[in-house]
């Protein structure tokens, strides 16, 4: 049985994503595969190429023939050079720089603000309804005291005149 290492297409219309699969040479492009050994996303920057090197070496050693696009990917990852015994087995794969964590970005922004907002809430918490009921009676008492004080103040002013 002739075995090929080929790409099977996934993804949307303008966003192709491929699996690197080992399949019988007679099967259609997206047909049944024997084993999936990697994935390739060409639209990402830099392109995502993940190949299980151990499985690729095995399939190449038992006679699986890579298609032209897969051969290029194997050369980029260095698996083809390793299989053939050529120099450059480390490959020339570009690696995406790791994203900084959101916590680190937040802490850096706080440090840059120097005395700006802290990690505490910026809005005061709302009082619960039970506290409002108790506070409402207290507010009514305080308002009554203010009215009495202003009434006494008016009486003293009229008495002085």
Curated annotation (Swiss-Prot):
UniProt keyword annotation of Transcription present: no
Tree of life domain: Bacteria
Disordered: annotated span: 114-161
Keywords on record: Ribonucleoprotein, Ribosomal protein
A single Gene Ontology CC term: cytoplasm
GO biological process: translation
Biased composition range(s): Basic residues: 124-133
Molecular function per GO: structural constituent of ribosome
Family: Belongs to the bacterial ribosomal protein bS16 family.
NCBIfam families reported for this sequence: PRK14520.1 (NF011093), S16 (TIGR00002)
Protein name from the UniProt record: Small ribosomal subunit protein bS16
Organism: Mycobacterium marinum (strain ATCC BAA-535 / M)
